[in-house]
Amino acid sequence: MEYDAYNDSGIYDDEYSDGFGYFVDLEEASPWEAKVAPVFLVVIYSLVCFLGLLGNGLVIVIATFKMKKTVNTVWFVNLAVADFLFNIFLPMHITYAAMDYHWVFGKAMCKISNFLLSHNMYTSVFLLTVISFDRCISVLLPVWSQNHRSIRLAYMTCSAVWVLAFFLSSPSLVFRDTANIHGKITCFNNFSLAAPESSPHPAHSQVVSTGYSRHVAVTVTRFLCGFLIPVFIITACYLTIVFKLQRNRLAKNKKPFKIIITIIITFFLCWCPYHTLYLLELHHTAVPSSVFSLGLPLATAVAIANSCMNPILYVFMGHDFRKFKVALFSRLANALSEDTGPSSYPSHRSFTKMSSLNEKASVNEKETSTL
């Protein structure tokens, strides 16, 4: 019975969770899987951590100290900070995987680190949704947007996003726990809030049922608020933008449409496997264990990779930068700065023109220097 996994000593015997809360069945996994999975996680997490700290750190520094403060820079700085904090705590989970799922940082850090990771997921998703909605409003209501779109409102919106993410991530502070199993300490979700050494008692079935209900509530809430609803809003916003641009013939170049499609597809591909497998975990007895022992580590790695891809997708691809010769600072500055014109996308042709002017200027500088 699947309820047994929530308050039975069996869960401590054959299931371990990594830093993100999923369980890997080590008894049923093949020796090859047991060896490859930790190595795979260490490599991917390390790569994501390096790229995420570098990319998001660069965005934070340039947008904060090198640029004029605008609504766009507020969005991107908050997004970069959320991803940066996520990557700061990745080394703990790299160590966890490298030590064959042995948690050495204590119960408090088990709760705090996973709370921060969950908080980052919600913050990033909500900020991407806010950015999409902001761009949509700028296209649909350019005059209203110019009159009411302010830095103060952007800060208030970001504050609300962080508070909401805190509330939705709070279950990690309650349910995350540690247990010593066969000489190893695992960090896992103890939804029943029962001690690992507890034995069956008359109220055992009630405790188990309560634990399962909490697991369902947390998983479904995470899927709806952290994926399905944001994806629906983001998709609706960009479809509206595309429809508006095509109807008004404001963009002859199809590059903006390709960027929009790339953003939506990438976000969907990064998080869809993660949430799908977590939903399947609610009925794990009906699914082969190999699906979780191999699928969950892979899905988690793909999901966290989104934190290092955001600087690329939302900054470097944000405008029409077709020439690699353009300086990195210019790319970031142009991407994070406010768009000229009544809305973000109607001025797309000005971006192309501005890029070409920048390139011509750089060529002229070279010619002058050679003379």
UniProtKB/Swiss-Prot annotation:
Name of the protein in question: Chemerin-like receptor 1
Membrane topology: Multi-pass membrane protein
UniProt gene name: Cmklr1
Species: Mus musculus (Mouse)
Expression (tissue specificity): Expressed in the differentiated adipocytes (at protein level). Ubiquitous. Highly expressed in adipose tissue and immature plasmacytoid dendritic cells (DCs) and at lower levels in myeloid DCs, macrophages, and NK cells. Expressed on macrophages isolated from different tissues, including peritoneal cavities, pleural cavities and spleen.
Its biological purpose: Receptor for the chemoattractant adipokine chemerin/RARRES2 and for the omega-3 fatty acid derived molecule resolvin E1. Interaction with RARRES2 initiates activation of G proteins G(i)/G(o) and beta-arrestin pathways inducing cellular responses via second messenger pathways such as intracellular calcium mobilization, phosphorylation of MAP kinases MAPK1/MAPK3 (ERK1/2), TYRO3, MAPK14/P38MAPK and PI3K leading to multifunctional effects, like, reduction of immune responses, enhancing of adipogenesis and angionesis.
GO molecular function: adipokinetic hormone binding; adipokinetic hormone receptor activity; G protein-coupled receptor activity
Ranges in the topological domain labelled Extracellular: 1-39, 96-112, 175-222, 281-298
Modified residues annotated as Phosphothreonine in this record: 340, 370
Residues the record marks as carrying a glycan: 7, 190
Residue positions where Phosphoserine is found in the record: 337, 347, 350, 356
UniProt entry keywords in alphabetical sequence: Cell membrane, Disulfide bond, G-protein coupled receptor, Glycoprotein, Membrane, Phosphoprotein, Receptor, Transducer, Transmembrane, Transmembrane helix
Pfam family, one: 7tm_1
